[in-house]
Amino acid sequence: MPQYQTWEEFSRAAEKLYLADPMKARVVLKYRHSDGNLCVKVTDDLVCLVYKTEQAQDVKKIEKFHSQLMRLMVAKESRNVTMETE
């Protein structure tokens, strides 16, 4: 389970993992108030990518990452619906 030290590396690897098989990929976001740790985990059951942070500024990056993944999911689904109706 590779744990990334920089957000840029993690986000690239996570997006690549999602695009490889969107139906199997899932994202878990966990916050521990006692430690002040925020952990983002992206997995497809074969590969598990982890990024941990204590920085408040990383929350904005994580929010942007989630919206980017949501856009990819919606774009993928809309293409599939269009293909099924034709």
Swiss-Prot record:
Q: Which domain of life is it from?
A: Eukaryota
Protein task: Component of the signal recognition particle (SRP) complex, a ribonucleoprotein complex that mediates the cotranslational targeting of secretory and membrane proteins to the endoplasmic reticulum (ER). SRP9 together with SRP14 and the Alu portion of the SRP RNA, constitutes the elongation arrest domain of SRP. The complex of SRP9 and SRP14 is required for SRP RNA binding.
What does the entry list under GO cellular component? signal recognition particle, endoplasmic reticulum targeting
Oligomer status and interactors: Heterodimer with SRP14; binds RNA as heterodimer. Component of a signal recognition particle complex that consists of a 7SL RNA molecule of 300 nucleotides and six protein subunits: SRP72, SRP68, SRP54, SRP19, SRP14 and SRP9.
Q: Name one GO biological process term.
A: SRP-dependent cotranslational protein targeting to membrane
One of the record's GO molecular function terms: 7S RNA binding
What are the alphabetically sorted keywords of the record? Answer: Acetylation, Cytoplasm, Ribonucleoprotein, RNA-binding, Signal recognition particle
- Please state where this protein is localized: Cytoplasm
| Family to which the UniProt record says this protein belongs | Belongs to the SRP9 family.
Q: Which SUPFAM superfamilies did the record assign? A: Signal recognition particle alu RNA binding heterodimer, SRP9/14
Identification of the protein by name: Signal recognition particle 9 kDa protein
